[in-house]
Amino acid sequence: MSDARSLPVLMYHHVSNKPGLVTLSPHTFRSQMRWLAGSGWKTVTAAEVELFYLGGKLPRKSVMLTFDDGWLDNWSQVFPVLREFGLHAHIFLITGLIGDGPVRERVDDTPSHRECEEYIKQGLADNVMLRWSEIREMRSSGLVEFHSHTHTHRRWDLMPGITNPLELLRADILLSRERMKDMLGSCSRHLCWPEGWYHPDYIRIAGELGFTCLYTTERRMNTPQHGACQIGRISTKERESSGWLKRRLFCYTTPVFSSLLALHKGPRLSWN
């Protein structure tokens, strides 16, 4: 089997029966995972991603599964499917929204994305976000890794009246890192930017805090030559057929398409 020249990274948020922004239905999500598993795609670990960017080898059909924010449906809808097909995934946590409490053995259908936002505004994040107990349960399976999505998910550069956005960003990332260390015993070197937005100063700050793999919402070929500071991701769609996913993975693993992808960067969605 030949080696991977580019690593496609799939970006998910919600998997729910309630349609809406950044949401796939359980049926579509399971169909995509079944197709990946049945087509011989290898879902990679964080350590394998780091080695890839250092020049290490991955099988040609390698893909990374990422989920942003830490929604409760990642526990109730995503995790059972990952177990069913033996797939590895990564969840970027907004650590300031993750609560305490026992594992929820039964979860009724979760709200839509807009409804989830309203719960959070009302101080009821626990109704729609993961708990540390559920995170530990998923982590112990060996199938799910957890990384930082900052502590607050704020775009400090857009906050009115803020004169020191870089200092606040540094504190935000640092607080997330320390919270993950306190609750999970460690924090990885992987960080996802809120709304996918970044610039060179952000990259510098993240590096100073120990983060080496930085995730965006841009469409790009991910190769060792491009480095791990601007990892692009493919925003997933609610499509019945696996053909859409097959075409996307072909494009993002075929070097001839790299120049085209560079001209068409993906949209930066709210709550990424």
Give names to the regions the model predicted:
Residues M1-V63, R268-W271:
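N-terminal pre-catalytic segment of deacetylase/amide-hydrolase enzymes
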Residues R5, L10, V15-S16, R60-V63, ...:
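Metal-dependent polysaccharide deacetylase catalytic core of the NodB/CE4 family, i.e.
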Residues K18-G20, F52-Y53, D73-W75, L97-V103, ...:
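Short catalytic/ligand-binding loop motif for oxyanion handling, primarily in non-cytosolic enzymes
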Residues F29-M33, E50, F79, W132-R136, ...:
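Generic structural signal for well-ordered alpha-helices
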Residues T43, E50, H151-R155, E178-R189, ...:
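His/Asp/Glu-enriched short active-site or ligand-binding loop at hydrolase and phosphoryl-transfer sites
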Residues V44-A47, V63-T66, W71-F79:
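Extended catalytic core of nucleotide-activated donor transferases of GT-like folds
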Residues S235-N272:
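Extended, intrinsically disordered, low-complexity segments
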